[in-house]
C-alpha cells in the first residue's frame, strides 16, 4: 500500500508506518496531560496488541472499553465514556485515541467533541468500512434508538491513522461490509475505479491496499469541495436512504438476522440503481450488471410486503429529509450522480420486487 499522506479538511490521513510516526511525533510535541484509548471489546483483544508496541511515550495512559456493535452506538454509551473520562482524571489537555470501527470512531469523536466542550482526538480505524468511510469527513455521533446517526456534530480529528495490519483481525463479513462503500465510491465518482472493484476477485491480495487508498482519495475530494454537505457531499448518501432504513429495521427487529452497515447499503444501492432506471433512464443492462456484481459479495435478503412497508416508514426519519420529502441520490450514469431526487413510494415497492427477483 502506498504511504503517501492525504491532506483532508484541516487534518491529514496517514498510512501504516507514517501513521505510527504521526501519532508518536504529535504526542511528543503536544505533551497531552493524559492519553485515553477508546476501544471496544473486539479491538481491545485483537487490535491493541498491534497498536500498543508502536506507541512510544511516557505519558500516563488509560484504556476505556465499550461493548462492540451498532446497538451500542447510543447516548447511554456516550454517558459511560464521559463518566469514565471524568473518573480517570481527563482534562481539557487530554488526548483521546479512538481505536476501532465506525462505531468507535463516530462515538469517540462525539464524546471528545463534547467532553469539557471539546478535547483533542485521533482516529485509528480498524475495520475496512471505517478506513474508507469514517476516516474522512469529520462526522461524529450516535444513533437515537434504531434511527441511524440522528445525534452528532461535524468535528475533525487531529489526524487519522490507516493501518492495513488491522484487516487481518476482521471476519469475512466485516471485510465485505467495507467493500460496499468502496463500490459506492466508484459508482458515484469514477467509472475506472468501479471497473477495478469489479475485478477485485482477480487482483492479488496486496492490491486491496491500493484500492483502499484510492477510495479514501475519492471521498476526501468530495468532502473537500463540500465539507458541510450542501451539494456534492450528498452524493455519498447513494444507497443510504433505503440502506439506513433497512439497517434500522433489522436493529428494531432482533428476530431478523442483523445486517452490517455495508450489507444494508449494498441492498440500498441495488434499489437506488433500479430507481435510477425508472426515474432517470439509467441503462437497464448496467443496472443488472451492478446487481450481479454486488450479489457476488452480499447474499440476497428476503423481505415481506409488510417489512417493506415498515422500512418505508423508517425512511421518513432519515436526517437528510427536508419538509417531509424523502430525497434520494440516483445515477444518470456511472460516475454521474444526481442529488435531491424525490421518488414516488410505489416505485420503491417496484425496486424491492426487482431486488428480490
Residue ranges of predicted features:
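Active-site segments that bind and position negatively charged phosphate/pyrophosphate groups
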Residues: 196-309
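ATP/NTP phosphate-donor binding region
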Residues: 1-94
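Generic secondary-structure signature for well-ordered alpha-helical cores
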Residues: 90, 156-159, 165-172, 180-192, ...
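Catalytic, metal-anchored helix/loop core of enzyme active sites in primary metabolism
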Residues: 9, 225, 250, 348-357
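C-terminal charged capping/lid subdomain of soluble metabolic enzymes
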Residues: 180-182, 284-357
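Short glycine/serine/threonine-rich phosphate/pyrophosphate-binding segments
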Residues: 103-110, 131, 244-245
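A glycine/threonine-rich phosphate-anchoring loop and its flanking beta-alpha core
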Residues: 110-200
Amino acid at each position: 500500500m502506498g504511504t503517501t499522506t492525504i491532506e483532508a479538511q484541516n487534518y491529514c490521513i496517514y498510512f501504516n508506518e507514517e501513521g505510527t510516526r504521526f501519532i508518536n511525533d504529535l504526542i511528543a510535541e503536544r505533551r497531552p496531560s493524559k492519553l485515553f484509548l477508546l476501544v471496544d471489546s473486539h479491538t481491545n483483544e485483537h487490535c491493541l496488541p498491534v497498536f500498543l508496541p508502536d506507541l512510544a511515550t511516557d505519558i500516563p495512559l488509560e484504556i476505556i472499553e465499550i461493548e462492540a456493535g451498532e446497538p451500542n452506538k447510543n447516548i447511554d454509551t456516550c454517558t459511560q465514556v464521559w463518566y469514565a473520562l471524568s473518573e480517570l482524571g481527563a482534562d481539557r489537555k487530554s488526548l483521546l485515541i479512538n481505536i476501532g470501527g465506525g462505531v468507535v470512531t463516530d462515538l469517540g469523536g462525539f464524546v471528545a467533541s463534547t467532553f469539557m466542550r471539546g478535547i483533542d482526538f485521533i482516529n485509528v480505524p480498524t475495520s475496512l468500512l471505517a478506513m474508507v468511510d469514517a476516516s474522512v469527513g469529520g462526522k461524529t455521533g450516535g444513533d437515537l434508538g434504531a434511527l441511524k446517526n440522528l445525534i452528532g456534530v461535524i468535528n475533525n480529528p487531529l489526524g487519522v491513522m490507516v493501518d492495513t495490519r488491522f484487516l487481518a483481525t476482521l471476519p469475512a463479513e466485516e471485510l465485505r461490509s467495507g467493500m460496499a462503500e468502496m463500490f459506492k465510491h466508484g459508482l458515484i465518482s469514477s467509472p475506472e475505479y468501479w471497473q477495478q472493484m469489479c475485478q477485485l476477485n482477480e487482483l492479488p491480495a496486496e492490491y486491496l491496499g491500493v484500492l483502499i487508498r484510492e477510495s479514501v482519495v475519492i471521498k476526501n475530494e468530495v468532502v473537500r469541495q463540500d465539507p458541510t454537505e450542501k451539494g456534492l457531499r450528498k452524493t455519498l448518501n447513494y444507497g443510504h436512504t433505503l440502506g439506513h432504513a433497512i439497517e434500522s429495521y433489522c436493529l428494531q427487529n432482533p428476530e431478523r438476522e442483523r445486517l452490517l452497515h455495508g450489507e444494508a447499503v449494498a441492498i440500498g444501492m441495488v434499489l437506488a440503481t433500479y430507481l435510477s432506471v425508472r426515474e432517470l433512464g439509467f441503462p437497464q443492462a448496467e443496472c443488472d450488471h451492478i446487481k450481479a456484481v454486488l450479489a457476488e459479495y452480499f447474499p440476497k435478503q428476503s423481505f415481506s410486503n409488510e417489512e417493506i412497508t415498515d422500512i418505508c416508514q423508517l425512511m421518513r426519519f432519515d436526517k437528510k429529509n427536508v419538509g417531509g420529502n424523502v430525497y434520494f441520490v440516483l445515477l444518470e450514469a456511472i460516475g454521474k450522480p444526481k442529488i435531491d431526487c424525490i421518488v414516488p413510494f410505489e416505485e420503491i415497492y417496484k425496486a424491492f420486487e426487482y431486488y428480490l427477483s
